Amino acid sequence: VLSAADKANVKAAWGKVGGQAGAHGAEALERMFLGFPTTKTYFPHFNLSHGSDQVKAHGQKVADALTKAVGHLDDLPGALSALSDLHAHKLRVDPVNFKLLSHCLLVTLAAHHPDDFNPSVHASLDKFLANVSTVLTSKYR
């Protein structure tokens, strides 16, 4: 459960991402594909090379979903229900991949916003991404 301080940290941190959210999402995906090559199996039809339009487009989808989640911190299950259905029933993504992408998102955010990425913000973002991952995998059971 996110505390009031966590919610404030998440909103402030994501607000600073601003118009770079899609680029950060794409960079996090690239980091995931490089660091955890087995994750590429879910994207056999994508050009996974650096800067590809398909990775950029999916990075924007990731960013849009996180932006929606940040706007609905008190109802993540409601806000992400359709996305949870998609990943569980149609795409059948291994739940561990959400944790891997979350890690890569944290690294990307820390790299681009080092002055704002203090231990408190790091912990809040980690909790937020863990909650998002839990919601996205909730319909697997």
UniProtKB/Swiss-Prot annotation:
Red blood cells. The modification Phosphothreonine is found at T108, T134, T137. Belongs to the globin family. CDD domains: Hb-alpha-like. Heme b binds at H87. It comes from the Eukaryota. The modification N6-acetyllysine is found at K16. O2 binds at H58. Involved in oxygen transport from the lung to the various peripheral tissues. The keyword Transport applies. This is Hemoglobin subunit alpha. The keyword Iron applies. The gene is HBA. GO terms for cellular component: haptoglobin-hemoglobin complex; hemoglobin complex. The modification N6-succinyllysine is found at K7, K11, K16, K40. Keywords: Acetylation, Heme, Iron, Metal-binding, Oxygen transport, Phosphoprotein, Transport. Heterotetramer of two alpha chains and two beta chains. GO terms for biological process: cellular oxidant detoxification; hydrogen peroxide catabolic process. Gene3D superfamilies: Globins. InterPro entries: Globin, Globin-like_sf, Globin/Proto, Hemoglobin_a-typ, Hemoglobin_oxygen_transport, Hemoglobin_pi. Residues 1-141 form the Globin domain. GO terms for molecular function: heme binding; iron ion binding; oxygen binding; oxygen carrier activity. The modification Phosphoserine is found at S3, S49, S102, S124, S138.
